Amino acid sequence: MKTIISAKDVHLSYGDYEALHGINLNFKEKELTALIGPSGCGKSTFLRCLNRMNDDIENIKITGEIKFEGQDIYGSKMDLVALRKNVGMVFQQPTPFPFSVYDNVAYGLKIAGVKDKELIDQRVEESLKQAAIWKETKDNLNRNAQAFSGGQQQRICIARALAIRPKVVLLDEPTSALDPISSSEIEETLMDLKHQYTFIMVTHNLQQAGRVSDQTAFLMNGDLVEAGPTEEMFIAPKKQITSDYLNGRFG
């Protein structure tokens, strides 16, 4: 698998506080990479660097290099709209817009200037099917998306992210606010989709990381401690601190 996103010596500071210390990490195309580590270790901060979601935070400074398909995303030639079209995001709390399921999923297409109603209809249906929420919504496309359960709302958000056909989807603890059944359904969806898209997922749930990810990266206090194939890391981590974390000795 080729590398689709690469991070080289990435440092991030909020004023005088340095949250990330020289992260070097490559993400392979059409795999799911889990970012794990204790609360406050920099997982979500790093994730948000990958499509520049940190840009509007006051007093933030980012150095180093992050490339998407070989292009420096912090370079002057980077089109931010194009970047976020290709690198979508799903947040911890379900965030459907306060309008219909159809309009939620079609939103990105319309913003991108797609006017072909037939194409939009087709893409909405395809995306809802990909996110495993079509059966629950096909007869309720005009219903307010916020009227659905939390797990259903999160799958609608995944469908919304997929509708513009991104190459990468960033997931910031996408199941942490959901019940176990809804979490399991989201995991099944990711397993079905991870050979079509590249997923990078922050999770506190080590069992979840073990179940769904191909690669895992362990962060601690803003440092990348270890990264590699999930099965190898979970069975035979190279660092003692990784073993301690995976075995619940802290975190």
UniProtKB/Swiss-Prot annotation:
<comment type="function">
    <text>Part of the ABC transporter complex PstSACB involved in phosphate import. Responsible for energy coupling to the transport system.</text>
</comment>
<dbReference type="GO" id="GO:0016887">
    <property type="term" value="F:ATP hydrolysis activity"/>
</dbReference>
<keyword id="KW-0547">Nucleotide-binding</keyword>
<dbReference type="Pfam" id="PF00005">
    <property type="entry name" value="ABC_tran"/>
</dbReference>
<keyword id="KW-0592">Phosphate transport</keyword>
<dbReference type="GO" id="GO:0005886">
    <property type="term" value="C:plasma membrane"/>
</dbReference>
<dbReference type="GO" id="GO:0015415">
    <property type="term" value="F:ATPase-coupled phosphate ion transmembrane transporter activity"/>
</dbReference>
<dbReference type="GO" id="GO:0035435">
    <property type="term" value="P:phosphate ion transmembrane transport"/>
</dbReference>
<comment type="similarity">
    <text>Belongs to the ABC transporter superfamily. Phosphate importer (TC 3.A.1.7) family.</text>
</comment>
<feature type="binding site">
    <location>
        <begin position="37"/>
        <end position="44"/>
    </location>
    <ligand>
        <name>ATP</name>
    </ligand>
</feature>
<keyword id="KW-0067">ATP-binding</keyword>
<keyword id="KW-1278">Translocase</keyword>
<protein>
    <recommendedName>
        <fullName>Phosphate import ATP-binding protein PstB 2</fullName>
        <ecNumber>7.3.2.1</ecNumber>
    </recommendedName>
</protein>
<comment type="subunit">
    <text>The complex is composed of two ATP-binding proteins (PstB), two transmembrane proteins (PstC and PstA) and a solute-binding protein (PstS).</text>
</comment>
<dbReference type="GO" id="GO:0005524">
    <property type="term" value="F:ATP binding"/>
</dbReference>
<dbReference type="InterPro" id="IPR003439">
    <property type="entry name" value="ABC_transporter-like_ATP-bd"/>
</dbReference>
<feature type="domain" description="ABC transporter">
    <location>
        <begin position="5"/>
        <end position="246"/>
    </location>
</feature>
<keyword id="KW-0813">Transport</keyword>
<dbReference type="InterPro" id="IPR027417">
    <property type="entry name" value="P-loop_NTPase"/>
</dbReference>
<dbReference type="InterPro" id="IPR005670">
    <property type="entry name" value="PstB-like"/>
</dbReference>
<keyword id="KW-0472">Membrane</keyword>
<keyword id="KW-1003">Cell membrane</keyword>
<dbReference type="InterPro" id="IPR017871">
    <property type="entry name" value="ABC_transporter-like_CS"/>
</dbReference>
<dbReference type="InterPro" id="IPR003593">
    <property type="entry name" value="AAA+_ATPase"/>
</dbReference>
